[in-house]
Amino acid sequence: MTTITCNADLEEGMAALATLDPVWGRIIARTGIPPLRRRDSGFVSLASIIVSQQLSVASAHAVWARVESVLSPLTPDRVLVASDEEMRLSGLSRPKQKTLRAVAAAITENRLDLTSLETATPEFVHAHMTAVSGIGPWTADVYLLFCLGHRDGFAAGDLAVQEAAKVAFDLPLRPKPAELTELAEAWRPWRGVAARLLWAYYAALKSREGISA
């Protein structure tokens, strides 16, 4: 099994992590089973990730509703023929308009094959996706984790994951992506569960203790 599809998969990974380090046992005691957060793979889900980046949940939902309305049906071809006015009406920032168009072009030109990524390694997915203009490490990581459901995906560049790791593992400073990637090597092949637990742990800490990102 290389993908996470249900809570039973999460529980298997949680048990494996808990045997590696007692810190995970304490995290799990605080969070319980973290949200699965699976979504379909493909262009629409990738577009949703791009739209929601650096927005609050409420803002992301509002902009996404406008994107789906203005650019319906949301396909790569529809994005490529969208006028500048339609893009403006969708509520997307100019950088996100550019990224969405770049992704649509990469798919139609067969430079980005989202179907082939479903059986690829995390490293290949990351390299393949970030080769497209506008797709950064965070976008690739989130797609890998929640759209492909890879059990060993991770999100070392996510600020909430970094902050949760800092608190949980009693680190002096919030780890940089490279530092967190190195720390997470010990969590293979369950880094996808580790990421979900750290997100859930961050949410618990933020709601109860008021930590900030």
Predicted regions and their residues:
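Alpha-helical ds-nucleic-acid-binding substructure associated with the helix-hairpin-helix region
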Residues: 4, 23, 27, 55-56, ...
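A positional/architectural concept
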Residues: 12, 18-65, 69-72
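Structural motif
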Residues: 36-44, 91-95, 184-192
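C-terminal accessory module of base-excision DNA glycosylases/AP lyases that mediates lesion recognition
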Residues: 1-34, 122-123, 137-213
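A broad detector of the eukaryotic-type serine/threonine protein kinase catalytic domain
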Residues: 51, 84, 108, 112, ...
